[in-house]
Amino acid sequence: MYISLTDLFKIGIGPSSSHTVGPMRAARRFLMELPDGMLSQIARVRVELFGSLAHTGQGHGTDVAIQLGFCGELPDEVDTASIAGRIATIAREQSISLLGQKSVRFQPLLDIRYNLKDLLPLHSNAMTFRAYGAFSDEAATTTPIAERTLYSIGGGFIVDEDEAFVGSPRGGEATMPYPFASMAELLVHGKRERLPLMDLLRANEHALRGTAATTSFLDRVIDTFFTCIDRGIATRGELPGGLNVKRRAPDIHHQLTVERGQRRIAPHKVLDWVSVYAIAVNEENAAGGRVVTAPTNGAAGVVPAVLRYARDFCDVEPEGLHDFLLVASAVGALCKMNASISGAEVGCQGEVGSAAAMAAAGLAAALGASNEQIENAAEIALEHHLGMTCDPAAGLVQVPCIERNGIGAIKAVAAASLALRGDGSHFMPLDNCIEAMRQTGEEMSTKFKETSLGGLAVNLPEC
């Protein structure tokens, strides 16, 4: 199945695509796909979380996301300002309205179970949903009338045990003008047709949904990216979760704005702008704000930061921003198809590493790079994230995640710049680097795969 722009760039809420966006969609899907008439028979729903969802779900807001999903909410539509009040009401009344149609008894502390011992075979991020019938005997509710296991495999994608791939087939994919499963195949298309990568990818997207819909979606993603940055640099205070992490983006942005009028500014200060854009996005994400998976929430700041840099400092026009995202989405799709974008599966190399590769390729494309230079930019960025662990402090998407996005964005700019200094010839193909990421992730201990059982997560300072 072709992974398109709309698959990769999902508008949703923070703090995690795999632990928030995915579980919300999964809870809703469980109820939506029940047999006709069964919803009215339900007296209670429960969910059991496994693996990384169990270990860090509370810090990532998985419990909140599941309750919203049971209520029928979607990540791109839910009113973020209403979430806290709705969750408080559910806890107080011990009742939840399934899809807004059927109220049943629900106790979050009892009906959301965190299984810290067992792992299911398909993926670490597993959820087993159970619905129980309207029996008068409480003991009888131990036998569910419906049960289904769903997996949140990164970037907001969800899959059940019977699906070979995520999502529903769109149909007509055999007529995709330029199908590809590797960068090598994409480069062959470009060489044969004498077209830049963005034109190939634009043709694919147009074949899926038409020119107007593709352009509209790209504009919506860009607007959401930049709105998130603007909101992040304007919002002060502490982030939720208990680590008492202070938002830094507003102060950094103020300092940079003041310094802009000064004559003697060190050239490297432009990197501070790139960094503050990324930090702003990830502080918004940590606070549960509206973000876009790029390719995940944990790495949501890299692509918009470099995109904003392209607009503000490189004078890239709107069409160039579209080119940026088209190319970035292809690189992200390859990382997902041939390795993983899930921190619970391959560590942070799959999240910030993939995001940096996407951003580097996108920036190179927007600045007029050849197809080979674009591939080189992506490979450089990904190569220098290989082996990066996912070990969030207290299970929150804050430390080291927020700063890591800033550094990842800077590395993406450096990778694109370095690639543009060459002629496109390079030693390591992107496809091989992605395979190295997959192999590295397979060998990585589960302590470093979004479980908060190792690394920085167990070496916090004593306060």
Residue ranges, per PLM feature:
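Non-transmembrane, aqueous-exposed alpha-helical and coiled segments at domain scale
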Residues: Y2, T6, K10-I13, M24-L49, ...
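Conserved phosphate/anionic-ligand binding catalytic regions in large, soluble enzymes, centered on
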Residues: F9-A27, A286-V306, C348-A356
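Alpha-helical support elements that line or immediately flank enzyme active sites
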Residues: T20-P35, P304-D315, A360-G368
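Short, mixed-charge aromatic SLiMs
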Residues: I42-G57, T89-I96, I252, L326-N338, ...
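C-terminal regulatory domains involved in ligand/effector binding and gene-expression control
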Residues: P75-Q262
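Accessory "access/gating" subregions that flank catalytic or transport cores
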Residues: T211-G343, G347, L456-C463
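Hydrophobic alpha-helical bundle architecture
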Residues: V327, A333-G406, L418-F427
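Extended hydrophobic packing segments that form well-structured cores
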Residues: F427-C463
